[in-house]
């Protein structure tokens, strides 16, 4: 258990006007390693996700998994968007935190017991609650649980929500805490998107239309796909789209610290060709080498 005011109490949650007095914490890593090492992003939505919602939930979390600054995905361990967000985070190597509306020993719904167990065993992941042992999953608990999801996170992303859905409550808490809110738009006649459309219409949430754009707006840098495209575009303008210098740079970007000998083996080029091309990139500031001739792309480029 972590008490309010203690060193391990989550800093973002402590900033809220109504922080819980204590958090029960179940994880294989210490609290600070879970909640302070990475930016926390809440991903929430209805339990009754449409195929459109399921697809976008996965796409958004997978894009965050490719970000320059990988986040920790926070959600509520419920059916629908929550479960997909947690599982996708684990699948792509992100950490994830499940906030429960029960005592720490009781996973609700019980069908997510195995998922919660995997989260507890995975370094950097956790299951948390502010309810003491023995607390049952009553309706009021879920409203209070939602404020913790919003409070732990620098931003909240709503996948699908009805106008009276719990995800809408989470989004409103996030607004109250001066945190960013993003919402996936849906059809005007789809009740599962009515809440998201309302958030966007009232300007309580920014619209989500592109996973990679969302990653950048969340302050997580660029995705691997955009970083690669950015490097190719930059070098293409400099040397021409078909230049072998682009391939060399992409090889180095994919394997930071690769030696010139390894580049020879990977590309099939001769040693003089590799040496000459590396020298051009280094002279132009697109490549760095150390005393052992190990190559990296400068951080300012990628």
Q: Language model features by range: what are they?
A:
Residues 2-302:
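Glycine-biased, small-residue-rich flexible motifs in mid-sequence functional cores and linkers
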């Amino acid at each position: 258990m972590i008490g309010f005011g203690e060193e391990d109490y989550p800093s973002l949650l402590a900033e809220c006007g109504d922080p819980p007095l204590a958090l029960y914490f179940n994880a294989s890593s210490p609290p600070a390693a879970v909640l302070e090492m990475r930016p926390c992003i809440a991903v929430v939505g209805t339990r009754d996700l449409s195929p459109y919602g399921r697809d976008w939930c996965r796409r958004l979390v997978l894009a965050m998994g490719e970000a320059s600054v990988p986040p920790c995905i926070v959600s509520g361990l419920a059916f629908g968007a929550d479960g997909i967000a947690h599982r996708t985070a684990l699948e792509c190597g992100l950490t994830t935190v499940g906030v429960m509306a029960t005592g720490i020993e009781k996973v609700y719904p019980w069908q997510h017991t195995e998922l919660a167990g995997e989260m507890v065993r995975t370094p950097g992941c956790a299951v948390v609650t502010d309810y003491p042992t023995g607390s049952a999953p009553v309706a009021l608990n879920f409203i209070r649980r939602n404020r913790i999801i919003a409070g732990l996170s620098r931003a909240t992303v709503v996948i699908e929500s009805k106008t009276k859905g719990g995800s809408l409550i989470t989004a409103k808490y996030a607004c109250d805490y001066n945190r960013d809110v993003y919402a996936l738009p849906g059809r005007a006649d789809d009740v599962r998107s009515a809440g998201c459309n309302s958030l966007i219409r009232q300007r309580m949430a920014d619209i989500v239309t592109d996973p990679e754009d969302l990653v950048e707006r969340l302050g997580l840098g660029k995705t691997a796909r955009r970083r690669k495209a950015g490097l190719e575009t930059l070098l293409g303008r400099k040397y021409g789209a078909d230049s072998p210098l682009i391939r060399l740079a992409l090889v180095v970007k994919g394997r930071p610290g690769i030696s010139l000998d390894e580049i020879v083996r990977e590309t099939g080029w001769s040693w003089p060709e590799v040496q000459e091309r590396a020298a051009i990139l280094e002279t132009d500031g697109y490549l760095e080498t150390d005393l052992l001739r190990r190559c990296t792309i400068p951080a300012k480029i990628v």
